[in-house]
Amino acid sequence: MKSEQQSAFLIGVVGVCASGKSTLIRGLESRGYRARHIAQEHSYVKDMWKRITNPDVLIFLDASYPVTVKRRQLNWLEADWAEQQRRLSHAREHADLAIQTDQRNADEVLAEVIQFIGEFLAKGQSNTTPQA
């Protein structure tokens, strides 16, 4: 059941292509959370994640180059993946939670995020994403 606090709370999700962002967001939304994909991996503006969405909490999902290629059959070079990592560096530094998804399935990632959000909300924190 969705609580008032939960529905007012905004979760931003960033990460490299094929790291599991869309899957995580669907899982969060199905449980009553507001979550937004922030396409930071495609932006040259290092703090776009903050300017566009300014989430209450920022989740960073990472995946290695070989795993991203396997998951989505992406037609890209390791240099493209490295460029996304570079573009995401500011968001990674400011993330409230960072998860390496190579060895985790979608349910494990979702469970970790929900546990983190529960603890975060229990502490009464909001709008605590560090300032740039």
Regions found by a protein language model. Give the residues of each.
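Conserved substrate/cofactor phosphate-moiety recognition/catalytic segment
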Residues: 3-6, 16, 26-56
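Walker A (P-loop) ATP-phosphate-binding motif of ABC ATPase nucleotide-binding domains
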Residues: 10
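Hydrophobic anchor at the beta1->P-loop junction of P-loop NTPases
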Residues: 13
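Conserved glycine(s) of the Walker
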Residues: 20
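Conserved Walker
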Residues: 23
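Conserved phosphate-donor/acceptor-positioning beta-strand/loop module used by diverse small-molecule
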Residues: 54-71, 99
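Small-molecule kinase domains that catalyze NTP-dependent phosphoryl transfer to phosphate-bearing small molecules
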Residues: 74-112, 123-132
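Catalytic phosphate/metal-binding cores of nucleic-acid and nucleotide-processing enzymes, i.e., regions
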Residues: 118
